[in-house]
Every structure is written in C-alpha cells, then in structure tokens.
Amino acid sequence: MDARIFQDNDDTSLPVNQASVTRIHKKPGKAEAEAAVRTLLLWVGEDPDREGLLETPKRVAKAYQELFGGYSGSPEEVLGTTFEEVAGYDDMVLVKDISFFSHCEHHMVPIIGKAHVAYLPEGRVVGLSKIARVVDIFARRLQTQESITAQIADSIQRILKPRGVAVMIEAEHMCMAMRSIRKQGSSTITTTFTGDFKEKADQQVRFMTLIRT
C-alpha cells in the first residue's frame, strides 16, 4: 500500500489554556515581565520613556506569551483523540514541510525552519493537524534543534505507540546569521528515528525519498 503524503502550510497556533509544564521557579507576573523589558531597553542605551517605546514593554510581554506558548501545551492532550477506523491502513503517514519558529536557548534569537514527521500506525491514527500542533508545542519554547527533534519523536512514540516514528528538521539559526560568524543562509539538519525507522534502513530511505519528492 502506498504511503500517504500531506503538506502542511496552515497556521497552527496553539491554544493558550493547555496544561502547564512543571516549573521550578514561581512565574513572575505581567508587571514584572514588563519591568524587565524596560530594564533591557535602558541597558542597550535606549530611553523607554520616549514616544515610540512607551508601550514596548507591554507589547513585548504580550508577544512573548504567544512566541513561547509551547510551555502551556500538552502533547498528551493534542494526541489524545485518535481514529481506529482507518480501513486497515498501516503504511507510513508523512506530514512534511511543517513550518515553525523557535528560539535558541543560548541567545534567545529565532530559529526558523520546517519539520517533516512520519509514523507507522499500529491501529490508530491522529488528525493531520495534530502532528503540526505537536511540532509547535516543542518549538515554541527556548530550545536547541536537537532537543526539538527528539522531543517530537519521543512524544509521538510514547503516546500513539506506533511501529516507528521519523522526524527531520531543517532550520536556519539566527544566532549564526545575525551574530558571531554571521553566516546567513546556512541550515542545520537533525533527524531522530524510532522503532522500524531506526531498525530498518529501507524505511529510512523511503522517508527521505518521500520528503524530497
């Protein structure tokens, strides 16, 4: 049976009311976050009281709630609803070209790229948008690309229990493009395989081939 391929170009914004991850430190309030932004403006040499920056602390705090919305996301909730009546389909399900953004945990500057995610169902499949939502849950945090890749694969494997999961991420890191060596246009590729994708080379080849199709 031929594998099904799906291309995702839709906006997959996360709901903001999902279960929070465990935090070691008490979460500061909105006023404290805005005060921190004001401090940074002063530190870089700006005047936070000039007209163009008066609302900036509020805007930045609000933007960060969206940009880092992954901390309030739960892959268990997203992948909790599955479909078992899939007419016996048990071949690869691949959702490719899932656009995402993240932020480097070292410098807090953007990582921009796309993810390709495949799994081999074991009697259960999920709605295609759910895969993209899982990508966003882990991407919208302070991250490394290696961690995002592994976390996506691990959550799908752990929750859906398929015969295998394959994840490839291609991304450009602004910490390389905007600072230090300043190499614009360079990309980083990371992969994680579980189950049949890890144990069977032909499944990896199929995955890679379908991504490039």
Swiss-Prot record:
Reaction catalyzed: GTP + H2O = 7,8-dihydroneopterin 3'-triphosphate + formate + H(+)
Pathway: Cofactor biosynthesis; 7,8-dihydroneopterin triphosphate biosynthesis; 7,8-dihydroneopterin triphosphate from GTP: step 1/1
Any one cellular-component term (Gene Ontology): cytoplasm
InterPro entries: GTP-CH-I_C/QueF, GTP-CH-I_N, GTP_CycHdrlase_I, GTP_CycHdrlase_I_CS, GTP_CycHdrlase_I_dom
Presence of keyword Cell membrane: no
Matches recorded under SUPFAM superfamilies: Tetrahydrobiopterin biosynthesis enzymes-like (SSF55620)
Keyword terms, alphabetized: GTP-binding, Hydrolase, Metal-binding, Nucleotide-binding, One-carbon metabolism, Zinc
Cysteines engaged in disulfide bonds, as pairs: none
EC code(s) of this entry: 3.5.4.16
Binding site residues for Zn(2+): C104, H107, C175
One GO term (biological process): tetrahydrobiopterin biosynthetic process
PROSITE patterns: GTP_CYCLOHYDROL_1_1 (PS00859)
Recorded GO MF terms: GTP binding; GTP cyclohydrolase I activity; zinc ion binding
Cross-referenced Gene3D superfamilies: 1.10.286.10, 3.30.1130.10
Quaternary structure annotation from Swiss-Prot or TrEMBL: Toroid-shaped homodecamer, composed of two pentamers of five dimers.
PANTHER family given in the database record: GTP CYCLOHYDROLASE 1, GTP CYCLOHYDROLASE I
HAMAP family: FolE
Family from the record: Belongs to the GTP cyclohydrolase I family.
Descriptive protein name: GTP cyclohydrolase 1
